[in-house]
Amino acid sequence: MPKLKPNDLKKRYDSANSHKDQWRSIYEDAYRYALPMRNLYDGYGTANVPGQNKMNDVFDSTAIQSTQKFANRLQSGVFPPQRDWCRLMPGDEIPDERNVEVQRILDDYSKKMFAVMRQSQFDMSMGEFLLELAVGTAVMLVQPGDEVQPIRYTCIPTFSVCFEEGPFGKVQNVYRKMKRPFNVLEQEFPDIKISQAMRSRYSNDETEMVDLIEGTYYDKLTGNYHYQIIDESGQDELVYRDLKSFPWIIARFLKLSSE
């Protein structure tokens, strides 16, 4: 789809979120009993009161322990921390006489790749990601970092995210509702454009939280992805980027076709 106006992006988010709400009661039960430490349902995500006791309805730890074992076993079996869990190898199109030379080059790339991933705290983010996957859906945002953290792996709670599917049931568009203190917006998003009216609104208390809607959606005409951040009202566009690749990793443990 072409680039959306802020109010149209708000409508797309509302529509996708309404569709997600059909599974809300299932998510509430799953997080309440199996993953209470990451539960943002039951009003925890909207109450703006962090640090609440989320264990009031938990009288048996079987589900919690089973969820943690599932995530730990999956991580140790597929993505073992502090280990090189995959190897880049020459493809079939590489001549046999060049296999040794190419493999040596690819091993150097693999070594560098894992060094960057460890420096970027991939193992920690993957642990959170697999806990979310135990509930059914896991979401990770992968963004460029800086010299200290070259890649930013951010596991996003499913409470904050809603999707639209493209062809073949693949997640194609992702919308997220998030909050940030006003005074960190320009640090986190260097290309943000804040209107004077918005600056005036938060001039008395720059630590006040700002409600934002983020959209990442596919443009089939260009093959790129539009990335936008707007204010919750859908009036102002704060950030726009034209992305060559999809920054989201979406994993669903079990997906029923056509649902």
Language-model regions: role of each:
Residues M1-D211, T216-Y225:
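Extended, helix-rich architectural segments
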